[in-house]
Amino acid sequence: MSVTIIDVAKKANVSKSTVSLVINNVPTVKEETRQRVLEVIEELGYVPNFNARGLTTQKTQSLGVLFTSQTNTTESNFDFNCETEIYPNDILAGIPDALVNTDYGLIIERYSVDNGPDQPLPKMIAQRRVDGVIVIFGLYSEELERRIADTGIPAVAVGGAPVLQDYVSADFQQSVYIATEKLISVGLKKICYVNCPPFFSSNQLRRIGFYRAINDHHLCVEDQRVIDTQWNTGKGGYEAIKELLMSGYMPDGIVTAHDGIALGIIRYLHENGIRIPNDVSIISIENSVLAGYATPALSSVDVNKRELGRKAGEILLQRIAQPTMPKVAMMSTPTVINRDSVKQGE
């Protein structure tokens, strides 16, 4: 007779659910208990039958990753989008770190939010192909959050603070605060913050972080500027700084919502003979792979994207195993990565 999960539980003196948590490598199990269960599994030669388990438990052993974005309607040949391309892929790179030694795989789906509240749910959710889903927040609306919650499929959001679901996020307000503070610390007094478009949920938090730094360091608010880009892209940054400079305002420092916007700004400044950091310093939020390849190399605030992905995976596994556990909400701690785009202090 084959060994069952009940046999393992009895031998290890734990519940069946604890054995299941160990098998799925859920990190909430005490290490002493985990080792005892693993030793019993090896001793008894227990092999989980995931196909049979899927039929009886309705589990797929798959997790979903949902990228929320808009259909690209611009025509620029450098229309890279940090929020819907590089940013989520860096988060995605961390999710498998949480799945090591589990039997879960990933299904990835891009979901356009352009079609309004009546559009179908993402296929992986509507067809119940996954046991849980990680949503890269971006354009994640309250309506979509509610519709996913109504399906009963566990979800963890990355990059925002939904009402109904667990989430992990960069601390957008603090990220912009310390970026602005960095420019102030080297003696800059006319600072422009180039924000993401206003339809992004983090727009207002980022704006608050900027003005909090300005006020805390007693800079004249009237000398500062905040611009919301039309596009969350390199083109958005290019057009925003072009409009600002043509208005006659010349900042000595620029903070941007993410590296993609910063690269568009850098391109415009280069084209118009404005030197970085001699004439204007620039710092961004994100610290993507793009930052080190900019000319000059872009100072940027690291928001720990890979770690956000790993934590999202861990939390989702916990939620699947323990549906009634308290809501989890966590934010990463940002740090400034100094490169060459900010001048030295006076």
Question: What do the PLM-derived regions correspond to, one by one?
Answer:
Residues 15, 61, 131, 189-190, ...:
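Short acidic/polar active-site loop segments enriched in Thr and Asp
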Residues 43-49, 114-117, 138, 238, ...:
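Short gly/ser/thr-rich secondary-structure transition/capping motifs
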Residues 47-119, 211:
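Amphipathic helical "hinge" segments at domain boundaries
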Residues 52, 122, 145, 180, ...:
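Short hydrophobic/charged patches on amphipathic alpha-helices used for structural packing
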Residues 66, 134-136, 255:
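Structural motif
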Residues 118-174:
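Short beta-strand-centered segments that line the small-molecule binding cleft or hinge
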